[in-house]
Amino acid sequence: MLFRSVTNCASSSMTEVLAAQVGVPFYRSKVGEANVVDCMLQHGALYGGEGSGGPIDPRIVLVRDSIGGMAQVLDLMVATGKTPSQLVEELPKFIMIKDKMALSKEALDRSIDRLKDALGADSVSMQDGVRLA
């Protein structure tokens, strides 16, 4: 089975970038553990993640499992001989800003249209709130 990965639409772009680097299909779900799991099942994903570092590995259980995630990090440390700091240093760096704005429906629609014009429609997701990539 082809490896596939899922995170929610509020997560950073790190998983998406890493998946692209190794040619793995990547999907985003709405926020919420149940939404991530539903998306994983829909696409046959072998790994998922939901905020707060909650890995979901269906080989273990279809819910967030910090203990399983910790075991996988320890396994990676043994396999590579690297410390957690060394492993983190190899990951791409991202800045994520989460903010809220009070806008009327009309002002919101105009703002989203301007963002799509400036950034390109593919860079603006309305899946679960507004996400700019």
Residue map of PLM features:
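Phosphate-binding and adjacent anionic-ligand microenvironments
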Residues: R4-A133
